[in-house]
Amino acid sequence: MIKLRLKRFGKKREASFRLVACNSTSRRDGRPLQELGFYNPRTKETRLDAEALRVRLSQGAQPTDAVRFLLEKGGLLEKTVRPAETIGKLKQAAAREAAVKQAAKDAAEAKAAAANESDDSGTDSTES
């Protein structure tokens, strides 16, 4: 399978990346099948070979997450929401709602218990 990934080059702590097409089993900085673009994260400079990228994508090449973000930013791919992210966000929202409901329920129970205790202590003192 062909992957579209970033190949690191440059000095220490001054990395730049080439967007390349390569076999999925090859090393990160191994020899690519084709160079398709350039990305510098410090200056946010991005150069993409749009035609070559369209050809590779039509052949079934799979972009990594970082490359997918660059392609979406460059207008070569439509912005997609991954199902796992959506499900995770829905679960988090449901958990938050459940926690709020539980907190409200606990507060109501504590208030009722405090009211019952004050009523009980008031009746005990009048009887004594």
UniProtKB/Swiss-Prot annotation:
Gene Ontology process terms (BP): translation
A GO cellular component entry from the record: cytoplasm
Extent of Acidic residues compositional bias: 117-128
Keyword line: Ribonucleoprotein, Ribosomal protein
Region (Disordered), start-end ranges: 107-128
PROSITE patterns to which the protein is assigned, alphabetical: RIBOSOMAL_S16
GO MF, any single term: structural constituent of ribosome
Residues passing through the membrane, by range: none
InterPro entries assigned to the protein according to its UniProt record, in alphabetical order: Ribosomal_bS16, Ribosomal_bS16_CS, Ribosomal_bS16_dom_sf
Coiled-coil region: none
Family affiliation: Belongs to the bacterial ribosomal protein bS16 family.
UniProt cross-references to NCBIfam families, sorted A to Z: S16
Protein name: Small ribosomal subunit protein bS16
Lineage, top ranks: Bacteria, Bacillati, Cyanobacteriota, Cyanophyceae, Synechococcales
